[in-house]
Design a protein with these regions (language model features):
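Surface-exposed charge patches in extracellular/virion surface proteins
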Residues: 4-6, 101, 109-114, 277-279, ...
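Gram-negative bacterial Sec-dependent N-terminal signal peptides
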Residues: 1-27
Length: 506
């Protein structure tokens, strides 16, 4: 991602305030959900863990049916992964131009624009959100000794996250946003027969969202809940198949987003914004002292993580060789807010493990669809935005296709397609028979994407307010950067992570 003047301000404010942060932090092949890609041994398998697990954290936060792996005693795991993303964004100035130079026509400003050329709002920057520590803690306990034939698992870890930091750029207006979802999981797994296991778990997330843009946003937190059901069946001595389902997870961030800097009816005087689109209507306004044209309005923002369904297979090729395959479907199109930017996503991952004495050599690969919609429409969950532009003027604007497209570009870390991972497991670590070590290192290969040209066919018949604001470049485009003259933004992302964990088995 990058920084920009007004441009960024507008798009980013929308993004940060609204979106659980925005691009750059803990993102990967599952959008910004983690799905065991940072956890214990599963991180070595690119997250592959639906049918078989090699560590307690992956059982607690993955398919709860795999908790039955830990019948017999107590297992405690403690570790961390350090994630290092790199996100850069180049923008031609379209968004900043739209916020600064269209007052009275498409946006509301109390001051006359300085008339800066559209291209003067361009930027090319690298996010400073470049290192994250992800904790992994879990314990499993066999309750058979109490006459209860189940395994209980509890744990704490980050379940999703994303973020950007462009405060170092003078054109960013202090743009920075961060979302961290810290999950507390509790689950039980039970053997139903010699071949079938079932499990159920509950996730309670403490979500923290900070939107650090001038005039728009702050830090808000919320609690969310998600349930997971899982089953696995051993179809032969060597092969196990498994299935799990996760519900949606909802968070509501109270008074997070600024909808207007100019009261409840900020667009009544705009010459290029029609009554049919809300020119004379009132914006959402959580405020106690406002009039139709003065005062700052805010709104609550409701965001849903998608429901997921996953299928996994594990197979022991011989006594020392294990291979695994996972397929996960993420229903972004049913998720409030994110359905405006994402389509459904499919993720495939494979893992292999070779045991050599007390050593376990591991490798994994993951591939994911790019979930970003090729065309976005005007904002629905967030219909308007209020901010302070790069010239210091309070601005209010409808969420045009241009701003939605710009915000989508801020989420670019979700376009990762390829993850490659390796790892090492050591049983009886340091000669201690009840202690094991899991380590991993992984990269997400560089991807880039251009934004703007996909909006070319977004006409008034599809809901666009005007040809000017539908989302194509207004400041020359990025044809010289491998995009087209209709693209306003190009984003490039890559990442690396490594980590380790110790497990005590009693």
């Amino acid at each position: 991602m990058k920084t920009l003047k007004n441009d960024w301000k507008l798009g980013a404010a929308v993004g940060t305030a609204l979106s659980l942060g925005s691009a750059g932090a803990i993102a990967g092949p599952h959008g910004f959900d983690l799905h065991n890609v940072f956890h214990g041994a599963s991180a070595s398998f690119a997250g592959t863990s639906i049918a078989h697990v090699e560590d307690p954290v992956s059982a607690v936060f993955g398919n709860p049916a795999t908790l039955t792996t830990y019948y017999g005693g107590t297992n405690f795991m403690f570790g961390a992964t350090f994630y290092m993303p790199r996100a850069t964004m180049k923008h031609d100035g379209s968004a900043g131009h739209a916020v600064a130079n269209t007052g009275g026509a498409f946006t509301t400003m109390n001051e006359t624009a300085q008339g800066s050329a559209a291209a003067s709002f361009n930027f090319d920057a690298t996010s400073k959100a470049d290192v994250y520590a992800v904790p992994t803690v879990a314990v499993t306990q066999d309750l058979s000794g109490l006459g209860i034939p189940v395994v209980l698992g509890v744990g704490v870890s980050a379940t999703s996250g994303i973020g950007v930091d462009y405060k170092h750029s003078s054109n960013s207006l202090g743009a920075a946003a961060e979302l961290i979802n810290l999950g507390v999981n509790a689950g039980i797994g039970m053997k139903m027969s010699d071949t079938m296991d079932v499990g159920i778990s509950m996730t309670i997330t403490y979500a923290m969202l900070e939107a650090g843009l001038t005039g728009s946003g702050g830090m808000t937190h919320d609690l969310g809940f998600r349930g997971t059901l899982g089953v696995r069946n051993k179809i032969s001595d060597a092969t196990t198949v498994a299935l799990y389902y996760q519900t949606e997870q909802e968070h509501q961030y109270d008074n997070l987003h600024v909808t207007s800097m100019h009261g409840t009816q900020p667009f009544a005087a705009l010459s290029s914004y029609s009554a049919a689109h809300g020119k004379t209507g009132s914006v959402v306004c959580n405020a106690d002292v406002v009039t139709s044209n003065t005062g700052v309005c805010r709104q609550d923002v409701e965001v849903e993580q998608p429901w997921n369904v996953g299928l996994g297979i594990s197979h022991n090729m011989d006594a020392n060789t294990l291979v695994m395959l996972d397929i996960t479907h993420k229903a972004w199109s049913d998720s409030k807010f994110f359905k405006e930017f994402y389509d459904d996503q499919n993720v495939i991952s494979v893992g292999i493990q070779k045991t050599m004495g007390n050593l376990k050599l591991r490798a994994g690969y993951g591939y994911a669809d790019d979930p970003l919609l090729s065309m976005v429409k005007v904002g629905d969950e967030i219909k308007t935005i209020g901010l302070v532009n790069s010239e210091g003027n309070a601005t209010s604007s409808p969420m045009y296709g241009l701003f939605m497209s710009y915000f989508q570009a801020m989420e670019t870390p979700v376009i990762y397609k390829h993850r490659v991972a390796v790892g090492l497991g050591v049983e009886s670590f340091l000669g201690v028979p009840f202690l094991s070590l899991d380590t991993h290192a992984a990269i997400q290969l560089e991807e880039d994407k251009c934004f703007g040209s996909g909006q070319a066919d977004y006409g008034t018949g599809l809901g666009a307010y005007s040809a000017t604001t539908k989302g194509i470049a207004l400041a020359g485009g990025l044809a010289s950067d491998g995009c087209t003259s209709a693209d306003h933004t190009k984003a490039t992302v890559s990442s690396f992570h490594l980590g380790g964990a110790l497990t005590w088995s009693f």
